[in-house]
Amino acid sequence: MDDKKAGAGVSAEKQKALAAALSQIEKQFGKGSIMRLGDGEVEKDIQVVSTGSLGLDIALGVGGLPRGRVVEIYGPESSGKTTLTLQVVAEMQKLGGTCAFIDAEHALDVNYASKLGVNVGDLLISQPDTGEQALEITDALVRSGSIDLIIIDSVAALVPKAEIEGEMGDSLPGLQARLMSQALRKLTGTIKRTNCLVIFINQIRMKIGVMFGSPETTTGGNALKFYASVRLDIRRIGSIKKGDDVIGNETKVKVVKNKVSPPFREAFFDILYGQGISRQGEIIDLGVDAKIVEKSGAWYSYNGEKIGQGKDNAREYLRENPDIAAEIENKVRAALGVVAMNPTAAAVAATVED
């Protein structure tokens, strides 16, 4: 009995000491700087923004890209990296979010962006001279708490000031990696607090002398690999033809890293030139997989009614009948256990209230 009383006394003292420590931390660093998971103040539901691709939203496991996180999208040239990020911008703008595009490559095509559904009049754009300037602008925008999405295009173009001011042949090893590491250390906490989604577009390089495993690596050192909650590897795997003309690319995206859901899932979709990701094409493919759309030979049918011979005609039918496309999409989402359309309405509303 005495041992139990002594144990209870020690436990009460520990609780008292813990309460005093928590009180001191909150006094010094502000309310919410430390909390119990069971108190319900920590968000369990992850707020997301759609990628514009139904298949990729499903592969991500939470219905889109998570807000308040860092995301990296990388792949070879002309694989669809900028197209995918511009689609995310369009989706965020549909929900009333404010977006910024840090164009370090100085290569943003405004006409193409508007064709993808981006409201270019409301898009904030910066074309910085140095990597430091680009990341300082990003930091200032994130800290403002009024930006929902920031795109940095691309990490490879974030050239340190010392390199720009130096001579062509100067050897400056590790400068860019140090710049990225410092910036991400500074940014991550603020990104989480302000619920801003920051997407880094990255390029691929080849490591020399690799005998085993993949020789591919991304630029800017290893920091981004660690800090990113989601990493997407995007590749062009084929061409889409209409007669003899190539009208788009068949694209594969692999979720290489995912801190919010199981990783290593893949999504396949079409990117049509001048139109972006073919939503209707995805609805057809996923509808066939889920047995919601029937395929017999070259014909596609829905509810016993033929909607087109060949994928191109079926895609055109769904473009002309958006109600049927939305109906099939919601059935596909229900079959795969993904939230019905507009998964980020609540997320944007929360930002507006803040």
Swiss-Prot record:
Gene3D superfamilies: P-loop containing nucleotide triphosphate hydrolases. One of its GO terms (molecular function) is damaged DNA binding. Keywords: ATP-binding, Cytoplasm, DNA damage, DNA recombination, DNA repair, DNA-binding, Nucleotide-binding, SOS response. PROSITE patterns: RECA_1, RECA_2, RECA_3. ATP binds at G75, P76, E77, S78, S79, G80, K81, T82. GO terms for cellular component: cytosol. The keyword Nucleotide-binding applies. One of its GO terms (biological process) is DNA repair. CDD domains: RecA (cd00983). This is Protein RecA. It comes from Cupriavidus taiwanensis (strain DSM 17343 / BCRC 17206 / CCUG 44338 / CIP 107171 / LMG 19424 / R1) (Ralstonia taiwanensis (strain LMG 19424)). The gene is recA.
